[in-house]
């Protein structure tokens, strides 16, 4: 699953339940989310972030200038990725909070983790820790929008790309 998560392939070797058995396991969820995010944000963004981070560490530039020195593409990719993860997490969390077939049986922290995992993986890799068929209709629609947007240019995810959507709203 780690290779599939990093490549955003969505290949699931666990059968028809995907990662549902690990819905409340923070180590598996966080590790998988990090792999998905890092590969979906794009390798050009990685290079830009690492190059500017190196300059901050070596004190070539002040730390407060770090984000402002990123290329426009990198800024849009980072901001849109964060915005989509947060908005998806909040939407799924509240829409599915009382649904006994998805988040309803979990404690609030587990619900937040599962909602965040769903938000991250829907845009790119396609894994699931909650039943996709049991989602409320509004959650399915929001997930379809996230799928349509996908990841960032230069990454391994599909979709119309985060920067394209950002440019539509600017």
Task: Locate predicted features.
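Membrane-proximal intracellular helices of multi-pass ion channels
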Residues: 1-170
